[in-house]
């Protein structure tokens, strides 16, 4: 029943969401690459190696371009798999006991896992990893108990599946080893060293296979990912880590943060009120006190929990941190879904520990204890649902949704009106910024849309997307001007064996520029345009007096024009070079 309720909440979150940032990058890549090519599957996606996520995303995007329905369905299905795998792991550790509901409730409703679920690109990484994490932990415990080799095989396969979606899944065998060893330690009378040795011996087949997979994946990762992205800013990493505890993890123990802020195009970040932060610390203190008073041998369990809370975040902060990094990065909470699962599994291990023989009687099983536990669980769920609802309100404040809806309608109308191509251009920076180039180009984002004009590097009718996604008439701004040519009544003259150098009235810095070129041609054909420093762009020409707009990447103080067709002669006049703006 709890899983069904969770799926209802997550379905509402999924279907009321929309594409955001990396989702649009995935759309652009799926529209411009072969889905089975190594360059697509093993692309360095901002430090991630995720062929499984690329393949799933690409297949869905190809089947229904820019349709949010199927990404939302995948979110719910993947969440179901992750939740069922966690339930299996809790059952393996605790059995079908009512106490199982305590850690399960925390895992299913904790707001700490919500941001990583709502963002499709992030969920394609984390949810398969969470399913693999729970499954491998359960298999490791069962292998240690029964010695059945099939658990070594299924555990290794599940681990490989997690790696295919997220390189962070490399933590899975280490978490599984820790959970199995701690369960062995708290359930018996061995010391911790003996429990570790027994865990290695009993699960050796799984551990050796997992280490081999880990080594191979590390080699692949190092070969794919640009290692220069790593930072050595330990001070900023420490500040991010501290902020994740004070504004994320600790308030999350009480169902916080309750409140979120957002400045587009950033994703929401947690801004818990002081009361929620204080409540989180009280909950943490109470859980530590009650667990220590009730259970024996759980010191290593708590140390492991704290250690993982630090270790699971340090690599990502080392990769993301710099002097310009905002501390709000740690408050987005999207790096914490695996921590929720690990804390849940460790809680199950702690609940398996023997009670203290001289423990407090009010902690013994009774109707009163059951009522108090149920009441606290209801309060936690209510607090968590409130945090989830406020997150959703912030998450839905996304400029991509109206922009893409308007753009799709505008593209369809433009296609119906004429066959004139659209000049390729960047989409609005609140939707996708230049740092994502070339996926921020309209030709990439809308590559799979069928009902649209072609995108081209040149056009005779200049139009642009305005900030709302509508197509409007456009002009070229006068950043620089083509100086009038030397030939009377012609300007600049170009033939196949006689290129023309069109001087500008000043230099251009490196950028994607647009030129308005007025020309007179004697026949159909094409010409090649290029800045002093930049690639050549092929532009079609037509006989007579015409005007063409072309997108020219590069820099320099002149434009070179080469006639690209035999017997083609061109006269070229002055015009602006700059950016496109509404007319």
Task: Give a label for each model feature.
Residues 17, 45, 49, 70-77, ...:
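Membrane-embedded glycan-lipid processing machinery
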Residues 323-355:
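Hydrophobic/aromatic-rich transmembrane helices and adjacent perimembrane loops
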Residues 98-117, 124-135, 151-159:
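Membrane-embedded helix bundles of polyisoprenyl
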Residues 2-43, 47-51, 57, 61-69, ...:
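Intrinsically disordered, polar/acidic, low-complexity terminal segments
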Residues 296-324, 377-380:
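Transmembrane alpha-helix segments characteristic
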Residues 76-79, 85-102, 108, 120, ...:
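Transmembrane alpha-helical segments of multipass membrane enzymes and assembly factors
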Residues 142-160, 165:
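Short hydrophobic alpha-helices at membrane interfaces in multi-pass membrane enzymes
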């Amino acid at each position: 029943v709890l899983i069904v309720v969770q799926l209802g909440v997550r379905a509402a979150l999924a279907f009321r969401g929309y594409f955001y940032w990396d989702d649009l990058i995935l759309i652009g890549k799926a529209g411009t690459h072969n889905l089975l090519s190594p360059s697509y599957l093993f692309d360095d996606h901002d430090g991630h190696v995720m062929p499984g996520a690329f393949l799933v995303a690409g297949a869905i995007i190809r089947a229904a371009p820019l349709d949010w329905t199927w990404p939302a369905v995948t979110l719910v299905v993947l969440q179901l798999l992750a939740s069922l795998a966690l339930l299996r792991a809790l059952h393996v550790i605790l059995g079908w006991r009512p106490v199982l509901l305590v850690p399960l409730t925390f895992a299913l409703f904790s707001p700490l896992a919500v941001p990583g679920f709502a963002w499709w690109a992030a969920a394609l990484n984390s949810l398969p990893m969470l399913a693999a994490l729970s499954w491998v932990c359960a298999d490791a415990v069962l292998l240690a108990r029964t010695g059945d080799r099939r658990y070594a095989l299924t555990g290794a396969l599940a681990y490989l599946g997690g790696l295919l979606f997220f390189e962070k899944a490399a933590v899975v065998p280490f978490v599984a080893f820790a959970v199995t060893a701690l369960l062995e330690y708290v359930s018996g009378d061995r010391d911790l060293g003996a429990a570790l040795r027994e865990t290695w011996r009993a699960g050796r087949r799984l551990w050796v296979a997992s280490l081999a997979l880990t080594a191979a994946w590390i080699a692949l990762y190092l070969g794919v990912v640009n290692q220069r992205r790593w930072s050595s800013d330990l001070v900023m990493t420490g500040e991010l880590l501290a902020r994740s505890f004070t504004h994320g993890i600790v308030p999350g123990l009480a169902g916080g943060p309750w409140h979120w802020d957002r400045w587009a195009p950033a994703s929401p970040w947690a801004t818990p009120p002081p009361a929620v932060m204080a409540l989180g610390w009280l909950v943490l203190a109470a859980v530590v006190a009650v667990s220590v008073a009730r259970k024996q041998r759980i010191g290593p369990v708590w140390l492991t929990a704290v250690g993982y809370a630090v270790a699971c975040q340090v690599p990502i902060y080392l990769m993301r941190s710099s002097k310009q990094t905002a501390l709000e990065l740690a408050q987005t909470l999207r790096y914490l879904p695996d921590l929720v699962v690990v804390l849940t599994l460790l809680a199950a291990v702690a609940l398996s520990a023997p009670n203290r023989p001289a423990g407090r009687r009010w902690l013994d099983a009774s109707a009163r204890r059951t009522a108090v536990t149920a009441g606290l669980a209801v309060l936690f769920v209510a607090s968590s649902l409130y945090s989830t609802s406020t997150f959703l309100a912030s998450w839905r404040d996304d400029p991509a949704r109206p922009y893409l809806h308007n753009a799709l309608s505008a593209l369809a109308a433009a296609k119906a009106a004429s066959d004139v191509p659209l000049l390729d251009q960047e989409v609005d920076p609140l939707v996708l910024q230049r740092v994502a180039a070339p996926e921020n180009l309209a030709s990439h984002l809308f590559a799979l849309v069928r009902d649209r004009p072609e995108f081209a590097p040149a056009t005779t009718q200049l139009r642009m997307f305005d900030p709302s996604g509508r197509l409007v008439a456009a002009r070229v701004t006068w950043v620089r001007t083509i100086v009038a040519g030397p030939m009377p009544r012609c300007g600049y003259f170009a033939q196949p064996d006689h290129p023309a150098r069109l001087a500008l009235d000043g230099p251009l810095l490196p950028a994607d520029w647009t030129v308005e070129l007025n020309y007179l041609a004697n026949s159909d054909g094409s010409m090649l345009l290029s800045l002093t420093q930049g690639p050549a762009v092929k532009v079609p020409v037509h006989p007579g007096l015409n005007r063409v707009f072309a997108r020219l990447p590069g820099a320099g103080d002149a434009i070179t024009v080469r006639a690209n067709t035999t017997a083609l002669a061109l006269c070229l006049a002055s015009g602006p070079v700059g950016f496109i703006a509404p007319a």
